[in-house]
Amino acid sequence: MAVFDGQYKKVLEEIYYGGYKYQDPNREGVERIEISMINLYCRPSVGFPALTTKEIYFKGAIAELIFFMSGSTDIRKLWEMGVRFWDKDWANFHKYSDAAMNNLYEGWKSKKKEYISKDTSSVYSMGRIYSHQWRNANGVDQLYNLVSSMIKTPMSTSLIVNSWNPADLPKMCLPPCHYSFQILCQPVGDTYKFNLVWSQRSTDFFLGTPVNIMFYAALAQVLEIMTGYKCDMVIGELKNVHIYDNQINVAKELMSRDPELHGESKLEIDKSKFKLFLENPSALNFNSVINLLSLQDFSLVGYNSYPKLKVEMLSYNKKQKS
């Protein structure tokens, strides 16, 4: 049995049977079923929280983590990893029509001269999203500072990375949903273990949460390698926890599936990529290590699941231009 599946199914049932309904303020004509808040957790030592009652988008979670850690805000970095679930929000940010969005993607994909002969970085910018805040929040590298502080002062109560920068919200293609995470260390003999707690203001439970928990469980494992400490728990403090009306049928199908049919999986990361930082944990070496990471360095081992459940991901409704 994959432990996370039973927990996930229980919350999904709570939303479906006990949630309140209302019109989504950000998506015209869309209704939500919602509960105010819940906590989710997993223990990485037991297994990686990859949902088995539907096939999960593992590549998407890892690509997003690599992207955020790199500090890039260029959507082409995600495209290079085969990930496109940020496309609609990026297009809305620039007020591109669907046709304009697809033309830019196809132009990049085919490497036409007009797309590579000049600096087009602003065209492909996603604004000051998570990755910018993590690595360059008003000139501060929050992610490196977190890792450095974990190593030097693990009992600090300020081991926090915050993506919610009010001054930058209008400059983001999407305000951060999971807006901060904190590391809580405790001594174990002559070393330490830690919990990673992330906070989320708005939670698409069907599509978003399975990716979010894999994202943070993978981040916790990266932190384990960099610090030498073991992660005890990954905990999500989730608010405005909802499913959309277009997800109801697939949610019902998932709830009908047996969460005990498949066993646990585990995440394996190529530790050799971190050698330079482990020898000398400087900011320069941190950047070098992060920039070396690729999808091929992360492997999900022993994963089996029910078939995929397809549903459209809804983006914000905004007026667009061609």
Where are these regions (language model features)?
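Terminal, non-catalytic protein-protein interaction segments that mediate quaternary/complex assembly
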Residues: 1-322
